[in-house]
Structure formats: structure tokens, C-alpha cells
Regions:
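Catalytic Walker B motif of ABC-type/P-loop ATPase nucleotide-binding domains
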Residues: 155-158, 397-400
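Hydrophobic anchor residue at the start of the ABC signature
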Residues: 144, 386
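Conserved ABC ATPase signature
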Residues: 130-134, 372-379
């Protein structure tokens, strides 16, 4: 087989929106082939066509030598697919999720354990924990294990590292490179330029069209004005000598487990202060205490001059908070989410109306104003979650792994 994937003239429209326009490319066996492009470029639609979940309007595609329309059952047997939102059953345990996916393909965990062993062993200590309670990095590893459990010939990964910490992101790509050495073909969509370099070849897709296919370095060179634009600038922070946050010996325990252990630090007004650490290090727990959402079990701290233990309601009025899971209401429209959160922060209807279109235009979401949030790509949800966190112009903004 010269090519394990062959795509010729594939087009797909949703109403008046053309998601893919005459897409053509081929993937060699054993290759890591990358798709890079902005949100809404057509990456997810292309993956759904290749994994036989959506029919193309025009063109032809083959995976593992099989036509995606005529031989979809055989392709589903030979392909593994990890969608952008991790298709896990949140109320099932880690072990139950893996067993379920193995059963779908008429196999067992034991039969193919050797293939997923290195990945699954990292989350096996939590095998009885519900998937919905896992960190982003753990969900990622479980989703990859589920996609591999039937021993596929090719793996489709739709932005698999979005929303996880840098340590987990690196670990994930190390796992993919090891799978490549074992002969697995991998097609991965990624929004991160540094991940491009792990691919053998890259296809740059924009507005539903393949703009170019080449090695990562050549794609970066060819499209440098788009992928690495010049002329970006930022305002120098106006850091003052006063402290916006002061923490001393802050501790949080859940039963016998210590999530945050006597941390102390200070953040000046106007400063950008970062937490760096792996999943489970305590970053989210620390942020939730600082935002007045969780009571500390020891130590003390102030945010915007208010005590986080006794004046947490005042703290909430001075801050903006963007949680790791983007606390948006999926069944509300974009503008309805903004209105809801702005109202919670005490803004008047007049203020909200005057500001909504301006903010959406700045974020490039004005045309999506009346779109249900559940229909938005992950990157657009990210923009919306950020906008509702800063809409009321807080003094301090907390961002929990926003990218």
C-alpha cells in the first residue's frame, strides 16, 4: 500500500457555510501527518469524513485502502479516533470506559494490554475513579488508551493536547513518537506550532482549503507571515509597589490528602504571575481558594485587600475567573452567556448592551453572537470564556490553564 490515506477533491458544506473545498492529500504508512489551522478551518469536519462519521458532498477518500462510504465498517475496525472533546463516558470509571471501548470492537483489555500498557499504567492507580473527576491530562491518556484498545492501523487525533498542561502535552507527544516507532500511522490536528515539529509532514488548512503540504520547517517558512506574524506588540505592565495578592502558609486538605501544602507568595498590582506544574500539583485548588470558591484548611491570604477566608464575597466582586473547563452555558447563545455573567457581576442592562458588540468584534465573534455555545469550536469557546471573565473589568483575573 503506497498510501494509507488518500483524499481527492473532498468538499463539504453545512448550509451556506463551506467547511471543506476541494481537499486533496495523501498519507504514507507509518507517518505522523499533521493538520494545522485556525478554529473553523475544517480540520474536525475532515476527520469526521475520514472516520466515516460524516459524508462528503463531493470527492473521494480512502483509509487503509477502503472507500469511506462503501467500506465504512472495515475502516471503523482499522481506525482509532480521539475527538477534540475526548469521547469518554463521564459517569463511568476509568476501567469501565476502557472495557466499554474494548467490547465495542469485540476484544478485551487483557488481549491488547501490551499496546496501551505504557499509557494506561500512568492512570491505572485511578482505575476506579469516574472519568468526569479526572484532570485534563488523565482524561487525555484514558481517551488515547480507548482509541488504541482494538489495535488500529491508523490513529486520528483531533487537537488532543488542547486544554492540558505543558508537562502532559510533552508526555503525550513522547507517547505518540513511541507508537510511530511501533509502526502506527498517526494523523493529528494541532493548534500549537511547537508540536508541528514532531510531525513528518504538515498540511496547513485555512477556510476549508489546503494551503500547502510539506515538512514542518518548510511550512513555517512558506507561511511565516500567517503562522508567525510580525508586528505584534504589548503594553509594558504598570507594576506598582502594592500587592494585589498576599498568601502565607496556605493549605488545603481533602481528608488525608493534602492538595496544597503551606504555600506562600505575593503578587504585585499590574504583574503577570504564573503557576507552573503538572496535573494534580494543586494549581486549580490554589486558584479556587484565592477566588473565594473553596475555604482553606490552614494559612491565610488576601486578594484585592480582602481576606479570602472571611471576606470571600467581596473577593468575588473584584476578580474575574476563567476555569479550566470554561464555565459556559452550552444551551445559551453567545450573547446570552455574556449577559448572564455580566448581570451576575452587577452590570446594568444599559452597560451590557453598549459593550457586548464591541467586545465580540474585538474577539472576532460578532458573527457568532446568536450561535449556541455548544456549536462553537473549542478555540471560540475559549475566547468567549475569557470575554465573560473580563467583561466587568475586574482588578484581578485568574486564568486556570486557559490554553
Amino acid at each position: 500500500m503506497d498510501y494509507i490515506v488518500s483524499v481527492k477533491g473532498v468538499s463539504k458544506s453545512y448550509g451556506e457555510v463551506q467547511a471543506l473545498k476541494d481537499v486533496c492529500f495523501e498519507v504514507k504508512p507509518g507517518e505522523i501527518f499533521g493538520l494545522i489551522g485556525p478554529d473553523g478551518a475544517g480540520k474536525t469536519t475532515l476527520f469526521r469524513i475520514l472516520t466515516t462519521l460524516v459524508l462528503a458532498d463531493e470527492g473521494k477518500a480512502e483509509v487503509c485502502g477502503q472507500d469511506v462510504v462503501k467500506n465504512y465498517k472495515e475502516i471503523r475496525r482499522q481506525a482509532g479516533y480521539m475527538p477534540g472533546r475526548f469521547s469518554l463516558y463521564q459517569d463511568l470509571s476509568v476501567e469501565e470506559n476502557l472495557t466499554f471501548f474494548a467490547t465495542l470492537f469485540n476484544t478485551t483489555i487483557r488481549e491488547n494490554y501490551a499496546l496501551v500498557k505504557d499509557i494506561y499504567q500512568q492512570i491505572e492507580p485511578f482505575k476506579h475513579r469516574r472519568a468526569g473527576k479526572l484532570s485534563g491530562g488523565m482524561k487525555q491518556k484514558l481517551a488515547l488508551s480507548c482509541a488504541l484498545i482494538h489495535r488500529p492501523s491508523i490513529l486520528f487525533l483531533d487537537e488532543p493536547t488542547t486544554g492540558v498542561d505543558p508537562v502532559s502535552r510533552k508526555e503525550f507527544w513522547d507517547m505518540l513518537l513511541k507508537l510511530k516507532q511501533e509502526g502506527l500511522t498517526i494523523i493529528a490536528a494541532t493548534p500549537y506550532l511547537n508540536e508541528m515539529k514532531c510531525c513528518d509532514r504538515i498540511a496547513f488548512i485555512r477556510e476549508g482549503k489546503i494551503q500547502g503540504i510539506d515538512t514542518p520547517d518548510r511550512i513555517l517558512q512558506q507561511f511565516s507571515s500567517i503562522l508567525s506574524p510580525e508586528g505584534l506588540s504589548f503594553n509594558e505592565p504598570q507594576v506598582t509597589g502594592r500587592y494585589a495578592i498576599e498568601v502565607e502558609g496556605l493549605t488545603k486538605q481533602f481528608g488525608n490528602f493534602t492538595a496544597v501544602d503551606h504555600i506562600s507568595f505575593k503578587v504585585k498590582q499590574g504583574e503577570i504571575f504564573g503557576f507552573l506544574g503538572a496535573n494534580g500539583a494543586g494549581k486549580t485548588t490554589a486558584m479556587r481558594m484565592l477566588c473565594g470558591l473553596s475555604q482553606p484548611t490552614g494559612g491565610k491570604g488576601t486578594v484585592a485587600g480582602f481576606d479570602i477566608a472571611t471576606q470571600y464575597e467581596q473577593v468575588k466582586k473584584k476578580i474575574g475567573y476563567m476555569s479550566q473547563k470554561f464555565s459556559l452555558y452550552e444551551d445559551l447563545k453567545v450573547w446570552e452567556n455574556i449577559r448572564l455573567y455580566a448581570g451576575i457581576y452587577g452590570m446594568s442592562d444599559k452597560e451590557i448592551a453598549e459593550k457586548t458588540n464591541k467586545v465580540l468584534e474585538q474577539l472576532g465573534l460578532l458573527n457568532e453572537k446568536n450561535t449556541l455555545v455548544r456549536s462553537l469550536p473549542l478555540g471560540w469557546k475559549q475566547k468567549l470564556a475569557f470575554s465573560v471573565a473580563i467583561f466587568h473589568e475586574p482588578k484581578i483575573v485568574f486564568l486556570d490553564e486557559p490554553t
